[in-house]
Amino acid sequence: MYTNLKVRFLFLVLCPLLLIHPDPGPALTYAAGSSPEKILANHVGFLPRGAKFCLLEGDSAVSFQVVEQKTGRTVFSGPMIPVKADLGKYLVGDFSALNEPGVFVIQAGNERSGEFRIAEDVYEEAIRKSVRYFSIQRCGPSATGYNAPCHVDDARRRDTRKYQDVSGGWHDACDVRKWVDATLYGMIGLSRAAEILQPSWDRGGIVEELRWGNRYFLKMQEPAGYVMNHIGDVFYHGDQNRWTDNIPDTPDDRLIQTNPCDPAGQFCFIMAQAAMVRLTEKSDPAYADTCRKAALRCLQWCRKENQGQDPNELGAAAAACAELYRSLGGREYRDLAADYARRLLELQVAGENNPAWPLRGFFQTARGNPEPFRDIYRGSWHLVSLCELLELFPDHPDAPRWKKAIELYCREYLAPMTARNNFGIVPYGLYTGKDPGGGRRIGYYWYRWFMEINQPWWVGINSNLASAGVGLFKAARLLKDPGLAVIAQRQLDWILGVNPFNSSTVIGVGRNNPAHYDVSYWFNPGTPVIPGAVMNGIGGTSNDMPDQKPGEWETCEYWTPMVCYTMWLMSELTAGKDNFR
């Protein structure tokens, strides 16, 4: 069922060449009144050896040229051909063969793209902006937060009403709340960028930022081992979303929701502390030991309470134990990671294909609940964890099962689904039962690219795309399958402008950033425009067509998981450029 994506696109490109003979020629000129930048290409650009695609709305094949911006020299020519798929009528062009560094535009007839770069460090500036984003979102007695110092008086426990110092950390989004399970992703994204890239420009800044964020998370851990839930909504929506007088133990102190945060958040806390052990054990052994003890206490509580039931939670649990093994060694963490992975694989749909069930490899929601698993923001831990276990323990007795599960999920589910839309993005998920909106069906299942909007809470797809991209890129390396790296690149392309709105949803990166969610009506000063922030992302209509909704929270609010996974994906692509070949 699965064919390598590069092979698929070579077929699409080479067949029309029998009829189309693009002339490299000189750079094209633009006709009077032509509309600029209708051709969609990643606003930031591409790695020299990476996948490179462009799109143009239409249904008739045309030739396109990649033109060096400075000289007007045509460096590549090829066809853009119509692909019948979801999300509109588009022509798709592939210029992955172009490896030359520089600044370029794409032209096709009277249409053009905006500028983009091809360079080994093409994503460095965007990553640096996202790192800096966290310092501007600092909460507590900082010198860099946009309204510093703030919330120095956080907070009063809801259960006892006693004051407990939990100041520090970061604001989670375009508000001033601090949701533990979501804001923890800042620790994941920053630590992955630091370890994957080991950037020369960092000079200790990422670890310093991590330690600031971790002030809050360590303070939110209870003696029992679990991490409390948040300073967010306690009695009604937004009741803690406000500024305070910064004087501890006064009536305007915000409240801590003291119950445990969700299981995935607990396991992300363990991952974060394990990473901090590695990043600080040489410079500050005492701090590293504090993080080690915090991780183990949380793991003990999670095991006692049998945390981890759905694919995301079990994947996060396996990843957390793998992180502990990387930091501490010890067979017990390897064995525990493998045990969580075994429970995860029990949820994978791995039966034989038939016309009514043309997909396999995806995961059920839980034991006894056959509904396909969907999650919009927590990320693809079910895929990422299996990749990390296979990479870390290639000789484990279960390694062949992990590899097979990765193959099934990527080749029998994600790859065929991404081929069903022109942009190559992964789906939000599959559905049984009635149509969730959009009338999209494959065999027995309905599917959507975007989360349903007929409910009180929904958000855009940036975290879903970027986290899947991380997993796909890891799988490309492990399976030696460049086609999966191509799909990973296309997830980032959508976020950075290859979408129907030609809009980058990373603030201060690329062009046409939509208006961000302005909360100044709620509290003042409101969250400013922050370069490096990643928005929730484009959402969908009830009929599952793209809808940007500029200025609305569902699509245009900053949110930590989106920042984490986008930064992580850019780091993976940069460090693993050979995965494309």
Stretch-by-stretch model annotation:
Residues 10-23:
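Bacterial N-terminal signal peptides
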Residues 22, 27-31:
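Boundary at the C-terminal end of the N-terminal hydrophobic targeting segment
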Residues 118-120:
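Interdomain boundary/hinge segments at the C-termini of tandem beta-sandwich modules
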Residues 1-11:
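Bacterial N-terminal signal peptides that target proteins for export
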Residues 38-59:
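Contiguous beta-strand segments within globular domains
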Residues 33-38, 65-88, 99-101, 105-114, ...:
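Glycan-recognition and catalytic cores of secretory/periplasmic carbohydrate-active enzymes
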Residues 90-96:
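Exposed aromatic-hydrophobic patches
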